[in-house]
Amino acid sequence: MNKPQYNMFCLPPAGSSASIYHPWKKQISDNIRIIPIEYSGHGIKINEPLIDDPDLLAMQIANEIQAYSDTPFILFGHSVGSGLIWKVLNYLNGKTISDQLRLIVISSRPEHRYIQHMRYKHELTDEKIIDELKRYNNFPNEILNNQDALTFFLKIIRNDFYLSDQLLSENIHKTEVPIVAFYGKQDPDIPNKRMMDAWQQHTENWLGSIEFEGDHFYFLNPETRIKMLENIAAIVETLTVNIE
């Protein structure tokens, strides 16, 4: 098997593990390798302590990415994963691997432009957190109906909400790396395309925003996911041609 031309590191949303990206591995173009990032205390790292410090978590992610320094790469982040991308860039800047970054795919609204103060979602009651999660139509009944599982999950999601809340105050710098923004048409957090287009303020190479059918977790739908991955492959192909 030929070595892929690109690695795509995928940062999960709050409360999720790297497994949310596993289906992508068989659906993406052959020249792109999907490398899901696992946060400490999540998924296969469930026995490791949760990290509520975005700088520490970003440093760990950056170190993981540097292990693949011989291959050009893409960063994909959904929800809190999008916010962490900018922290990760801070740790990659100045490193040789930073020159290998070809594309950033943002799958989240630019909250720092709409919320000018720290949010306190992590301090909500358990009931309010559950209500918040239900808005996104992705809260499994097997967790909701199992008190032990619910208690365990709420500890993780509260930690991740705290990460997200802190990232709101992050000063996002401008990058020369091309950025494209993806979102779901029915996402309750994104009322219009104009909101997503605000990401263009943070790059010298804005590739636009692309709307997909679906809600906050639009890419969980297999058909939508294929369309999304085809878009990424097409963008990467264009960038490759331009480089050559």
Task: Report residues per predicted region.
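Non-catalytic, mobile gating and regulatory segments of ester bond hydrolases
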Residues: M1-E244
